Amino acid sequence: MYKIVCTLIYLIIIISSSTAEETFVSLKKNKVNVRYGPSFDSDIKYVYKKINLPLKQIDKKENFRRIIDLKNNSGWIHISQLKKNNSVITTQNKILFKKPSSFAKPIAQIEKGRLLIVDKCQEKWCKIESGDYQGWIKTKDIWGLIN
């Protein structure tokens, strides 16, 4: 009985340590190949052409990360093409505010699908940059953060 319990505990530890913690990453370059499998020998599935694009990392195998984007496209990218996430995408048209409050002065209208660079986040708000604008947006209105 003792051996069975030890074996089960060992298997649980191995299985849980092999699964990747879900996190967000961003593209490091303007052109990044997404592959069918975690190898340079694997065929290219499609190509991203947007630096800083946020992606959800859902798995890892050696030097490759399995990702999924906002539109549920998935594939494998080599870690040399990824960086720690600092960007998000708006999930709907929203107002950018001067301060982290819905009662603050509105600065700009941000369109759905806009790529934003995150400066910092606090509670339910993130301070972001978007072209010529810098301001605050609610975290529920953006994709690319682990809440």
Predicted features along the sequence, with ranges:
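Boundary regions of SH3-family modules and the immediately adjacent low-complexity/disordered segments
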Residues: 21-33, 37-50, 54-109, 115-117, ...
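Sec-dependent N-terminal signal peptides
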Residues: 4-16
